[in-house]
């Protein structure tokens, strides 16, 4: 039997899907990302959303101002697609190096997505230009039809929206974000070099039983929602396969405690502080620690056409216990795995 490593040295990772919010929340959560990640794709679903080059530049400056001294962190900005968005704004932002990608939220699919796209046909001109200039499209892949069960919305999206979109724009670089189903995993793994996906820590570690059995656990509630264990296992097998078009995207999405623990709680898991420990734990359980660095640090830059980070981090096989709460002024955040321990810590 091969001895398991006690220290893993990997290239500094990037987070290819994160919500940093703004103001006090931004200042509170950013250090948990900037300490260990070199770059992050920052979601644009603020209120109001980031739809112009000017608003993206201003938001990037607010993020950089909140980076703790000594952290080398670079936010990668995205543009929020709307039915009425001017295609020239997208092209200009990408060519200036302000926008790294554009984000497609189906209208009302998730938090702050009411301004989202009502039909792909409404943005076909934008997608055509994005394909031409090589700008990636990031997709929250769920249909919003009320007649479709919440557990089926990702698979239905692939069938009715994503596949036709990719047929129409075959050379458009597409990232199907935070995939949660065996259908999505199979679709991406069997796809071509223009299709990639991110996977979150919570969808690899947990399934819907963890959220619903023995009481409702609101801090595991996110969108897309946790699925049954067969889907969780399919995701785990996909990352263990070493597919080069799967990469780290935490979808870390903080909400104040009272907005999660309510009669109508918000969707989102704040996992930045536990993400790397969680990924290492899952990859070890799948006997795939040799695939961890590529998933965390190499596959994303390759797909985006960016260099890998030139610094390194180390994961140690030692117990780390995560905080029960994180102070947020007069409020607090309940982080992923609050009060729980894992056997991989990060330095």
Swiss-Prot record:
Zn(2+) 1 binds at residues 17, 19, 103, 251. The keyword Hydrolase applies. Binds 2 Zn(2+) ions per subunit. GO terms for cellular component: cytosol. Its cofactor is Zn(2+). It catalyses: (S)-dihydroorotate + H2O = N-carbamoyl-L-aspartate + H(+). GO terms for molecular function: dihydroorotase activity; zinc ion binding. The active site is at 251. Its EC number is 3.5.2.3. Keywords: Hydrolase, Metal-binding, Pyrimidine biosynthesis, Zinc. Gene3D superfamilies: Metal-dependent hydrolases. PROSITE patterns: DIHYDROOROTASE_2. It holds the Pfam family Amidohydro_1. GO terms for biological process: 'de novo' pyrimidine nucleobase biosynthetic process; 'de novo' UMP biosynthetic process. The modification N6-carboxylysine is found at residue 103. Zn(2+) 2 binds at residues 103, 140, 178. Pathway: Pyrimidine metabolism; UMP biosynthesis via de novo pathway; (S)-dihydroorotate from bicarbonate: step 3/3. Substrate binds at residues 19-21, 45, 140, 223, 255, 267. Catalyzes the reversible cyclization of carbamoyl aspartate to dihydroorotate. Belongs to the metallo-dependent hydrolases superfamily. DHOase family. Class II DHOase subfamily. Homodimer. This is Dihydroorotase. It comes from Pectobacterium carotovorum subsp. carotovorum (strain PC1). The lineage of its organism: Bacteria, Pseudomonadati, Pseudomonadota, Gammaproteobacteria, Enterobacterales. The gene is pyrC.
């Amino acid at each position: 039997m091969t001895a398991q490593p006690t220290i893993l040295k990997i290239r500094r990772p990037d987070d290819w899907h994160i919500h940093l919010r703004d103001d006090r929340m931004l200042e509170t959560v950013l250090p948990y990302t900037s300490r260990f990640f070199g770059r992050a794709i920052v979601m644009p679903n603020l209120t109001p959303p980031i739809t112009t080059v000017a608003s993206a530049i201003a938001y990037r400056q607010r993020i950089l101002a909140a980076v703790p001294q000594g952290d080398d962190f670079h936010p990668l900005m995205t543009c929020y697609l709307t039915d009425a968005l001017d295609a020239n704004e997208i092209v200009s932002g990408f060519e200036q190096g302000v926008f790294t990608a554009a984000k497609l939220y189906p209208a009302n699919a998730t938090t702050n997505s009411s301004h989202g796209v009502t039909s792909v046909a409404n943005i076909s001109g934008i997608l055509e230009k994005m394909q031409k200039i090589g700008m990636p499209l990031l997709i929250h892949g769920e249909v919003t039809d009320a007649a479709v069960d919440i557990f089926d919305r990702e698979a239905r999206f692939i069938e009715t929206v994503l596949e036709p979109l990719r047929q129409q724009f075959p050379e458009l670089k597409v990232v199907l974000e935070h995939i949660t189903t065996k259908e999505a995993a199979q679709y991406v793994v069997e796809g071509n070099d223009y299709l990639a996906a991110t996977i979150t820590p919570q969808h690899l570690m947990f399934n819907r039983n963890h959220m619903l059995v023995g009481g409702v656990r609101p801090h595991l509630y996110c969108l897309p929602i946790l699925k049954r264990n067969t889907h969780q296992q399919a995701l785990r097998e996909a990352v263990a396969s070493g597919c080069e078009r799967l990469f780290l995207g935490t979808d870390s999405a903080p909400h104040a405690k009272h907005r999660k623990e309510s009669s109508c709680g918000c969707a989102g898991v704040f996992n930045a502080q536990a993400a790397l420990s969680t990924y290492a734990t899952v990859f070890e359980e799948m006997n795939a620690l040799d695939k961890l660095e590529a998933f965390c640090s190499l596959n994303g830059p390759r797909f985006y056409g960016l260099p890998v980070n030139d610094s390194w981090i180390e994961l140690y096989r030692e117990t780390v216990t995560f905080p029960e709460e994180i102070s947020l002024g007069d409020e607090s955040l309940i982080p992923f795995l609050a009060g729980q321990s894992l056997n991989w810590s990060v330095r």
